[in-house]
């Protein structure tokens, strides 16, 4: 994907997360927000790494040759958000990374079991996630902004 397309998708995923969270007819708010927010942050960091010329695809070495890992449908496997955050070149500060890793943990719970009503207990983390996303995608002094 092109860097610009990744940025657009990142922004739209976060906007969708906020819109769904604020919809009074939706009860699956936090879970949906977290899933879309993780996609948004992943695309944002993929755009950053692409801009920096950092290969964010999984691979293994076969002799001296680099062999890229692929999905069962033949697409390259790209780093998930936690791997993006753990990269030494990540532009994300430790507080934002900690917030995102907290949400990644909850996303794992969402994926593997039904969650109880969690909206009230994590709403501050969700607000921080969306605000930090806006800051990182638009603030010109941040390294993550793609030029």
Please report, for each region that a protein language model flagged, where it lies by residue.
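Short, charged, amphipathic alpha-helical segments
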Residues: 31, 123-124
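Active-site-proximal cofactor/substrate-binding loop regions of enzyme domains
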Residues: 25, 35-58
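Short secondary-structure subsegments characteristic of cysteine-rich extracellular domains
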Residues: 125-135
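Charged alpha-helical initiation segments
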Residues: 1-36
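A structural signal for well-ordered alpha-helices, especially hydrophobic packing surfaces
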Residues: 21, 44-45, 107, 111-114, ...
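Single conserved hydrophobic/aromatic residue that forms the stacking wall/gate
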Residues: 135-146
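A broadly used, surface-exposed interaction patch
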Residues: 49-123
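Hydrophobic faces of stable alpha-helices that mediate helix-helix packing
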Residues: 7-15, 100-107, 130
């Amino acid at each position: 994907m092109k860097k610009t397309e990744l940025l657009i998708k990142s922004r739209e995923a976060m906007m969708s997360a906020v819109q769904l969270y604020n919809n009074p007819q939706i009860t699956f708010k936090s879970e949906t927000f977290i899933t879309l927010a993780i996609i948004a942050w992943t695309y944002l960091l993929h755009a950053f790494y692409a801009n920096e010329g950092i290969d964010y695809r999984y691979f293994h070495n076969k002799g001296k040759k680099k062999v890229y890992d692929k999905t069962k449908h033949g697409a390259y496997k790209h780093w998930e958000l936690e791997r993006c955050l753990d990269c030494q070149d990540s532009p994300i500060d430790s507080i934002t990374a900690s917030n995102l890793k907290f949400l990644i943990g909850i996303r794992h719970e969402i994926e593997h079991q039904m969650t109880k009503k969690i909206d009230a207990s994590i709403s501050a983390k969700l607000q921080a996630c969306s605000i930090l996303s806006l800051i990182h995608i638009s603030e010109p002094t941040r390294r993550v902004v793609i030029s």
